[in-house]
Amino acid sequence: GKATTKKVEIPERDRYDNGYDNHGHDDFEHDQTEVDIQEVVRKEKESYDHNERDIYGNARNDFEHVQTEVDIQEVVRKEKESYDHNIGDRYGNIHDDFEHDQTEVDIQEVVRKEEESYDRNEGDRYGNGHDDFEHDQTEVDIQEVVRKEKESYAHKYRR
């Protein structure tokens, strides 16, 4: 079947500074990458010897724990649009055989820090006993959005 693309409207103010361009380009090359995120939520490594208590007062049996938690929801949309000579694009720009590659992803970041205190032999939520335990936890839920565009414009069009 024929490939279809969904037009994505991007406000002009988000693309150019204060009407700097106003739809007129002089052989304009534009490479844009918005948002480069690499986020690690929580990483911990705990080593326990046989029947020795860990830093939380828990008893383990030769336990090796490496934990990396990242909760990422990623939405990626790629579209490729070709414009023929003298055909205006969605922004009203005229292109000469224009190739447009767009990758969009949106980012919302929620960070929660919680501190938990445990008294001696008062089991925590995992059923572990702690001796005045202080726990700092940072959880990040990320929706990642990245936009990449490359645009070539001829210099003949003025608005």
UniProtKB/Swiss-Prot annotation:
It comes from the Eukaryota. Component of the organic matrix of calcified shell layers. Residues 1-33, 80-159 are annotated as: Disordered. This is Gigasin-1.
